[in-house]
Design a protein with these regions (language model features):
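Conserved S/T- and glycine-rich ATP-binding loop of Class I adenylate-forming
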Residues: 22, 59, 132
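A structural micro-motif
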Residues: 4-5, 51, 78, 189
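Short, glycine/acidic-enriched loop or turn micro-motifs at the edges of active sites
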Residues: 26-27, 37, 63, 138, ...
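Conserved beta-strand hairpin/beta-sheet module of binuclear metal-dependent hydrolase folds
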Residues: 2-49, 141-153
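Active-site HxH/HxHxD metal-binding segment of metal-dependent hydrolases
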Residues: 37-121, 206-210
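Short Pro/Gly-enriched beta-strand edge/turn motifs at strand-loop
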Residues: 1-6, 98-102, 124
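Metallo-beta-lactamase
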Residues: 51, 95-96, 126-214
Length: 214
């Protein structure tokens, strides 16, 4: 079993976002989830021998989660992974990814378009892609079964859920995504959300006021 660890790096752009780094300590190779800001700081981290960046993963395409993507991709020459739906509907349109709202239009594309249920072999482990529409049309969570860990983006928070009043959002789809897909994971699954603190699936099933288990 690989020696894996998840680090949280909160980045400060237009709002605070939890950027996560999954590293294999046996090889020092890593991937980053949702590098939303602080491209210079992240570049410094990934220029060290203990964090060799291999890929960028996006849970969704909102501006606060993608702000450093283009700079990191250009500097390190690594691919960007996102759901096919998100790549087609959100990433390339500044009005939909909300970057134009904040006066800094961003457009980008995904090099690898992911499908629901797809499993990726990377860093000596498997990452399962779980499509969770609701916050955006192509929101995607990433489940690392070996670590009993879920990178949840803005789908599921500690005792809350993501907003659905932005373009392509849907409250009914979000609740369905959480109940049918995320709450089906083991209760001790650790949840690493895009904002706020970590939690577990079991805790959310009992205490999430916005999406009780049902």
């Amino acid at each position: 079993m690989a020696d894996l660890e998840i680090f949280r790096k909160t980045v400060y752009g237009y709002m605070d976002v939890n950027c996560y780094i999954l590293v294999n300590h046996d090889t020092n190779e890593c991937v980053v989830f949702d590098p939303g800001a602080e491209a210079e700081t992240l570049t410094e981290i990934f220029s060290t021998p203990t964090f060799v960046l291999k890929a960028i993963f996006l849970t969704h395409g909102h501006h606060d989660h993608i702000g450093a993507v283009n700079e990191l991709k250009e500097h390190f020459g690594v691919p960007v992974y996102a759901s096919k739906m998100e790549a087609e509907k959100v990433l390339g349109d500044p009005s939909v990814n909300l970057s134009s709202m904040f006066g800094n239009p961003i457009s980008m594309h995904a090099d690898e378009m992911l499908e629901d249920g797809q499993e990726l072999d990377i860093l000596g482990t498997k990452i399962k892609c779980i499509l969770t529409p609701g916050h955006t049309a192509g929101g995607m969570c990433y489940y690392i079964e070996e670590m009993q860990s879920l990178i949840a983006g803005d789908t599921l928070f500690c005792e809350s859920v993501g907003r659905t009043d932005f373009p392509t959002g849907s409250s009914s789809e979000l609740i369905r995504s959480i109940r049918d897909k995320l709450y089906a994971l083991p209760d001790d699954t650790k949840v690493f959300p895009g904002h706020m603190d970590t939690t577990t699936i079991g805790w959310e099933k009992k205490h999430n006021f916005a999406c009780p288990e049902g």
